[in-house]
Amino acid sequence: SLIVGLKQGVTREQFTQALKDSKVAACVHRFPVKPGDSILVESGRMHAIDAGNLILEIQQNSDTTYRVYDWGRVGLDGAPRQLHLEESLQSIDFDDYEPETLKIVPGAQTLADCKEFRIRKFELEPGDDPLELAAGESARLIHILSGALTDLTSGLGLTKGNNYLQAYVTGASLRAKEPATLLVTDRF
């Protein structure tokens, strides 16, 4: 599951007390997730990742992760990891609540389109026309979720688990060698 957002009505004071009392779970939403689910985590939305998840998290480059609560986890040295309580409390939007799993409509391919980025999902089959991504539109991150494909422009072979940073000046022509699912992130 993923922990995303505060429940409606949770105030800064209530959340601070829950942190002191180790009762954070009562203040947050826990979403059961399955492969392919998408949740847009807006800036200021408290979130955490439960064990057993492999996620794609798109975020601004930063040397800091504000850890407000650590769910009883410890670091590799066996000691509790550093928390950033005050910084976290300052950055959490306490008026933001009730996030939801993004609904993926058959035939639709845009998972999120916000001011920071756009992410689209594509499913390609062998024999389909190549997916054409024009040069000069945006730099792109291409994430291969399943299958195998070739960038006909560069000759690069891409398979499940590969991530490919495509420069602004470079286009791509992606052809499936086997059924493939990929995410393309741009406009960042």
Residue ranges and their predicted role:
Residues 38, 44-45, 169-170:
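Short, surface-exposed secondary-structure boundary micro-motifs
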Residues 1-35, 45, 49-100, 104-142, ...:
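Active-site region of the double-stranded beta-helix
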Residues 151, 155-188:
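C-terminal structured interaction module
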